Amino acid sequence: MKDLDVIGIGALNVDQFYRVERILEDGESVTRGSATYPGGSAANTVHGLSRLGAKTGFIGVVGGDAHGRLLTRAFKTAGVGISQVRAKPRARTGSVLCISDELGHRALYVTPGANSLLSADDIDPDYLKRAKILHLATFVDDRQFELSVALVQKLPRGVRLTFSPGSLYAARGMKSVAPILRHTFVLFINRQELERLTGQTLESGVRTFMKEGCRTVVVTLGAGMKIGRTDAVCYIRSGDREYIIEALPAETGRRTDTTGAGDAFAAGYLFGVLTGKSEDVCGRVGHLAALSAISKMGARQGLPTLAHLSNRYQRTYGQSL
């Protein structure tokens, strides 16, 4: 029985944010503020989907510490199922040191912690069968990468895989990631990751992913790039059709923090998939979700509710969502 829309699997981290005037290569600077928020790429996407009304769950590992309790409490508050989130009593919860400046640039330093303890014993095959979609994101260590590869080879029938490789898996190269791409229904990747993974330009790289087996490739373009006459924020290829999503201004007039923007985009896009929208509408919904997310510090603080997202979609595109 498919009683869950999306199950996420990936690292569970606490993001420790520091705002600075500018990121230095060497020197000393005063912080403008700091805060601690729940994070992790797949976790952010699943959290965002839950806020939009999707039925979600998560597979992952936290430590038996205050940060682990923070992460599970955040999931519970959002309505994400946590029956498959394992707490390892003697481990410390994973963390990411996030340094962002006033221009929206950022530097991330990852301590995997308890995430490195996730094993096949922590994954219940019967739980996976309950999902329409499994959304996979990254881990730091080789063991969890290999576990991810093995998992997608045995994915239950009827469960579609969506995949966000991020910079960590992009650095592993195409040969390593190909076994996952072969089973991918929707690939979420940004332009820099595409270029690093394939060594190719946008459209050539997308064609490579399609040849590897991806059904749909969604490339986010950060602050945007010109494609023809369009200021594009996203390029989508599905089968033999392509879609270009036009960039819109941020809600606050500037980017407060871009951490988690891609995760928010994936949440909006997948909401569109779950509700039967076309690829271009999915892309627009993803773009609006990302704009909302970057209006506040932290990957999840600005994630929209369905009411907020629907209202802005109506105002922007003159259509109901």
Question: Which sequence ranges carry the predicted segments?
Answer:
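Generic secondary-structure signature for well-ordered alpha-helical cores
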Residues: V14, R51, V80, E102, ...
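Conserved post-catalytic alpha-helical subdomain immediately downstream of the catalytic base
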Residues: R51, L221, L248-Q319
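Short pre-catalytic strand/loop immediately N-terminal to key active-site residues, enriched for Gly-Thr
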Residues: S29-G39, V206, I244-G260, D280
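Short, glycine/acidic-enriched loop or turn micro-motifs at the edges of active sites
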Residues: V14, Y18, G64, S167, ...
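Ribokinase/PfkB-type carbohydrate-kinase core domain
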Residues: M1-L12, R73-A87, S100-L248, P304-H308, ...
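Short, glycine-/polar-rich solvent-exposed loops and beta-turns at beta-strand/coil boundaries
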Residues: P89-A91
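Glycine-rich phosphate/adenosyl-contacting loop at the front of the ribokinase-like
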Residues: M1-V61, A66-R73, T77, R254-R255
